[in-house]
Amino acid sequence: MTSSLSRPSGRRADELRKVALTRHYTKHAEGSVLVEFGDTKVICTASVVERVPEFLRERGQGWLTAEYGMLPRATHTRSDREAARGKQTGRTQEIQRLIGRALRAVFDLEALGPRTINIDCDVIQADGGTRTASITGAFVAAHDAVSKLIAAGKLARSPITDHVAAISVGVYEGAPVLDLDYAEDSRCDTDMNVVMTGAGGFVEVQGTAEGVPFSRAEMNALLDLAQAGIGRLVQLQKDVLGADHV
């Protein structure tokens, strides 16, 4: 890390934004969380449906899927609702599939039984890192939904096998940095999103050079940064769940 690096936010290269996870944010969903990464704010809900998609009928297992969207004025300028346009963008489809894959990586779907957990991630304010914030918050929402199933006697044990969280990293002004906000993300040389389990396994790595190719050494440095950051996020998840951890 270079000591001369000046991030727009004034953070150190390895410093997360202020992260907050507020549980039980809405009253109807089985699990709900407001996740905040600095000025990025996402409402994550987990809803339980006592059925599975057609392709899983008679398989004796459950399913977890995700949807993602942004409010029209979540960004600097208003965007039309995708429902009004009649179709989702490729970006939206990519992100919601990523969220679903990330959470399924830490779920025993057979132990979940023949039911579906629907994750909804709605971005109410975007300042970079909405997909990584969504994954980190959605895990806690899904955990609370599972806790309610156990309390209701619908599950004998938790189907959750580990924690999962995600963070962005990038090369900004020639230096690897953790948790990019919009000001950095829009000007970085490399942008990477990393999803990992609490045990340190990689679920997904999405990395792109924005004009300037990155070296193997830079990639290793970015992954090291991401692993350390995700470790702190997993600890925050555990702290927030506290005695309710299943």
UniProtKB/Swiss-Prot annotation:
Q: Does the keyword tRNA-binding apply?
A: yes
Q: Which UniProt keywords apply?
A: Nucleotidyltransferase, RNA-binding, rRNA processing, Transferase, tRNA processing, tRNA-binding
Primary enzyme class: transferase
Q: Which reaction does it catalyse?
A: tRNA(n+1) + phosphate = tRNA(n) + a ribonucleoside 5'-diphosphate
Q: What is its EC number?
A: 2.7.7.56
GO function term, MF aspect, one: 3'-5'-RNA exonuclease activity
Query: Per its UniProt entry, which superkingdom is the organism in?
Result: Bacteria
What residues bind phosphate, as annotated? Answer: 91, 129-131
Relate the protein's function as given in its record: Phosphorolytic 3'-5' exoribonuclease that plays an important role in tRNA 3'-end maturation. Removes nucleotide residues following the 3'-CCA terminus of tRNAs; can also add nucleotides to the ends of RNA molecules by using nucleoside diphosphates as substrates, but this may not be physiologically important. Probably plays a role in initiation of 16S rRNA degradation (leading to ribosome degradation) during starvation.
NCBIfam families per record = RNasePH
What the record says about family reads:
Belongs to the RNase PH family.
Name of the protein this chain belongs to: Ribonuclease PH
Q: Which organism is it from?
A: Burkholderia vietnamiensis (strain G4 / LMG 22486) (Burkholderia cepacia (strain R1808))
Taxonomic lineage is: Bacteria, Pseudomonadati, Pseudomonadota, Betaproteobacteria, Burkholderiales
Q: Which gene encodes it?
A: rph
